[in-house]
């Protein structure tokens, strides 16, 4: 069986794609995988994402490749995939989740306690920015774009004191930094689906040979947890650029979901959490989302 896999050209995207291929080979050793490298609209510009359509730009070109028959599946950093996707497509599988947390790379000589000072910290995401400003409103948040290594290089060029990155990206790329600190969930709750690799397919192919193969390699715990997180974002009418954090952890049939929403400048932060059994997932999640909305979560993220 031949499987054409659409992916972005970045080092991280390619590494994630090879991780998918390894898992495909584990369940279907005779499958032939062809990588279809693409440059998304988001890769072709350094403009801030919120001015050019958001992180969905990283996804749309790969979806077009599937729709046009150029590729059979697409590999994504699942946190970059909009909570609402066209019904023509489906997230068919996820790989086991990497570390879902956020990390800060600090200039030599600084410690995490120095975040109480007026430092120059680089991050491009409203979620991270708002949580940083909630810690210290005097921080100077500097927007940054590019792949992980490009961003790290900018620390020296732009005289930055720190850079926020996903711990999963550092782990997958095996990037070591001499002065790194991983945020606790209380300090910075991650984005929905952060650390997870998602595999997208044309919805009509879910029961095809490729679709059935993806069911075999799917990590069910990651799939369920990220689906719950993405449901929260969708229910709050958020997107990849909304200051919404959601993290679901599953052990056996027990789930714990934490959500944090904030306004853009971090002056207003609302936290909510719930524990439930997966057998009662639909009702528990519906009640939880109703609580979020009743307590003004939608209004907060729009401020």
Language model features by range: what are they?
Residues 48-73:
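Short, structured active-site "lid" loops
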Residues 11-25, 54-58, 83, 103, ...:
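N-terminal winged-helix
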Residues 1-39, 45-47, 51, 134-303:
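Small-molecule-sensing regulatory modules
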Residues 78-81, 168-170:
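Short glycine-rich anion-binding loops that position phosphate/pyrophosphate groups of nucleotides
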Residues 78-79, 87-138, 205:
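A conserved helix-loop-strand patch within extracytoplasmic ligand-binding domains
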Residues 4-6, 74, 92, 122, ...:
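Short, well-ordered beta-strand segments
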Residues 71-75, 161-162:
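Short, Asp-centered acidic motifs that coordinate Mg2+ and/or phosphate
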């Amino acid at each position: 069986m031949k499987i054409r896999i659409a992916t972005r050209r970045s080092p991280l995207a390619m590494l994630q794609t090879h991780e998918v291929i390894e898992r495909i080979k584990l369940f279907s050793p005779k499958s032939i995988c062809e990588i279809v490298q693409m440059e998304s609209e988001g890769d072709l510009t350094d403009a801030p994402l919120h001015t050019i359509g958001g992180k969905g730009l990283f996804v749309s070109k790969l979806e077009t490749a599937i729709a046009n028959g150029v590729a059979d599946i697409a590999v994504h950093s699942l946190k970059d995939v909009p909570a609402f996707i066209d019904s023509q497509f489906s997230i068919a599988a996820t790989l086991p989740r990497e570390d879902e947390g956020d990390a800060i790379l600090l200039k030599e000589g600084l410690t995490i306690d120095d975040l109480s000072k007026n430092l120059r910290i680089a991050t491009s995401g409203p979620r991270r920015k708002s949580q940083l400003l909630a810690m210290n409103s005097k921080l100077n948040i500097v927007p940054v774009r590019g792949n992980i290594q490009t961003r790290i290089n900018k620390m020296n060029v732009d005289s930055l004191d720190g850079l926020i990155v996903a711990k999963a990206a550092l782990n997958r790329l095996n990037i070591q930094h001499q002065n790194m600190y991983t945020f606790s969930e209380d300090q910075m709750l991650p984005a929905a689906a952060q650390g997870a690799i998602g595999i997208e397919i044309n919805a009509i192919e879910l029961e095809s040979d490729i679709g059935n193969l993806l069911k075999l390699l799917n990590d069910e715990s990651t799939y369920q947890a990220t689906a719950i997180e993405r449901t929260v974002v969708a229910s709050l009418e958020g997107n990849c650029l909304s200051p919404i954090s959601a993290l679901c952890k599953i052990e056996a049939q027990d789930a714990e979901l934490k959500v944090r929403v904030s306004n853009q400048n971090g002056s207003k932060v609302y936290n909510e959490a719930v524990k439930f059994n997966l057998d009662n997932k639909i009702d528990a999640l519906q009640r939880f989302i109703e609580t979020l909305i009743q307590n003004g979560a939608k209004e907060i993220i729009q401020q």
